[in-house]
Amino acid sequence: RVSGLAAQVWNFEPLYRTPFVKIGDWQFAFSETTIIYQMWEGLYWDIRFSIGEDGETFMTRFGKPFEHYIQEITCAAAKNAEEKYSVLFQNEFPYMYKGESKASSDCYFRIGNVLIAVEAKAKSPHSDTLTGVSREAINTEVNELMVDPVIQVLTRLNEINSDDNNIPEETLKFFFGVEQTIILSVSMEKVQPIGELLFDFDAQVKQHLSHTNVVCYHNISVEDYEVVCNLIENCPDELPTILTSWYKDQRVDKRSAVVLVNYLSSYGKQYV
């Protein structure tokens, strides 16, 4: 019986779809997370299904406001950071590279000599990924939400740091003197950071990281990123260390699954 239960695929999706349990006249919620998830994801799908277009068209249109939201909260956090800390913000910008039109990552911010590059993806894992039923589905979304954004950021940085672009000197100054780079891929919902998946992720991006100063990279949900923005405002000097330490703790072994809310608690920070 025990071995049978261990091998069983557990699908917790119904708890996200219907986070309340009703007993008589009382309604109970077992998790604040499932309520917040339903408010955000539920609203998204209500809007999605109210539009009689194909999913690709909707996602293309939804992507821009999602990116803009990430840019806005990052800019606001950088401006509101404690005055004694220098937090600089750089929004997305167009440029020409070897005669081709390009666009930078969605936004960047700097804390001292540490550059944090942010790439927003208006996507979330599908049901097959959330339930762990299909390894093929999981691998596809590891690529879309984790691997591809990291490679995209690295490609843009290589172009920005080359001599073959027409980027104004004033914009280029933002990237001068960077000693460490952190990459954040922000999606509607993240692929859960389980050690085994992270090791596969690392193997796929390893060759692209050679001769770079990238110290860590994460795929995080928009909710996680809002917490990151709060850290930018209140303790920006600690944020690079928090992100790099969290990166290492997630990779202790293949069973590691260190989510941000738990890690911040152990670090003495609130998930707000």
Task: Locate each region found by the language model.
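Catalytic cores of nucleic-acid endonucleases
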Residues: 122-181
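A short acidic/basic microdomain associated with nuclease active sites
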Residues: 77-102, 107
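Active-site beta-strand-loop-beta-strand hairpin of nuclease catalytic cores
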Residues: 109-127
